[in-house]
Amino acid sequence: DEFIEANSESVIASLAYWCSALQPLERQRILGCYSTDFELNVSIVTFNYTTLLPRLFHAFGTSDHATPEDSWGVSSIRLIHLVQAHGALGREPICGVNDASQIGSDALSKNEDIASTFVKGEIQKLFGSVDDRRAEDIILGANVLIIFGLSLGETDIRWWESVVKLLKKGDIHFVLIASTKAVSARRSPASFRRFSKALKEKLLTRGGANDDEKRLLSERIFIIPAGSIFRFKSHIPDAD
């Protein structure tokens, strides 16, 4: 429709802005591992159940697109994959907890029927879904992984564990957390240091990293403003 047509180019092309959103030393650290003017191959894992991102994805297409002039070192962008990790509204959306320990009752947590109803991984096994496996493959295959629009909550611990696995693969793998609070946190160096440290700690703790690992892995986690990427030209129209 008109909204998708008007926004697909700006939304997807804006993913190239992650590089210009970094601080100079952070950018230097990442670009030092890769040649500049590189082609950005993008795979998207979304926890959203709606059709919005898939429609934007398909409207943009999978051919090479030129990037905006100020996208810093990225010459072109191409979409590769999009996976709705927890299903979609039209096909068995997966809602629930990460594991049975998060069910607030010992009796209920040991009940197989309850587990197959409320534990995300068990629900996906029951329905024979491969969405979560495809999503994990994308995460573990990334060079630069951007976390956008997520609270790093306990019900998605298995995904944060995958993020930590990615960081452990080597020094050429990086994670960017796109935060809506990044701009306000930068009002002073001290406030941004505290904010950044807390966010990294939350991700690494949820991902199962030990203290020694946290010190090393946190050096390859950077915080960028959420407004840097996924830029819409217009608002989603209200339903009639």
Residue spans for each PLM region:
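Extended, H/D-rich, highly charged conserved domains that either
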Residues: D1-V130
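SIR2/sirtuin-family catalytic core signature
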Residues: V42, G73, D131-D240
